[in-house]
Amino acid sequence: MPFIYRRRVQFYETDAQGIVHHSNYFRYFEEARGEFLRSKGFPYSKMRDMGLEVVLLNAYCEYKKPLFYDDVFEVHLNLEELSRFTFTFSYIVFKEDIAVAKANTKHCMVKNGKIVSIPKEVLEVLKD
């Protein structure tokens, strides 16, 4: 079951053609990740309090249809892969029932500038 994040396109997110600039999709994905973690009781601020940072290793997005100013859309987020050191999320952006973008991001955790294994309490939150 995906985590669903709902949002409306703001005017400043559009480009000269009146569509959402491609870079903003990655902001939407980051917002969805943050809300997903918050909904699990483990927001980024809690990880930072533990001295951990969530670092992006790679990101991919396939754009299928445009979004326009004032469109309401949903980001459906799923945890696709989880290992001791990395985790991967997939995203599908829907406008009504139409998929307008598909993406994934891979992450790791860093403490004191070095990649570390994902702490047990974070693994439990991600698995749940």
Swiss-Prot record:
Q: Please provide, alphabetically and separated by semicolons, the GO molecular function terms listed in this UniProt record.
A: fatty acyl-CoA hydrolase activity
Parts forming coiled coils: none
Tell me where on the tree of life, at the top rank, the source sits: Bacteria
Which residues constitute the catalytic centre? 15
Q: What EC number(s) are associated with this protein in UniProt? A: 3.1.-.-
- Pfam families of this UniProt entry? 4HBT_2
**InterPro entries, sorted:** 4-hydroxybenzoyl-CoA_TE, HB-CoA_thioesterase_AS, HotDog_dom_sf, YbgC/YbaW
Entry keywords, A to Z? Hydrolase
Q: Does the keyword Hydrolase apply?
A: yes
Q: What's the family?
A: Belongs to the 4-hydroxybenzoyl-CoA thioesterase family.
Q: What is this protein called?
A: Putative esterase aq_1494
The organism is Aquifex aeolicus (strain VF5)
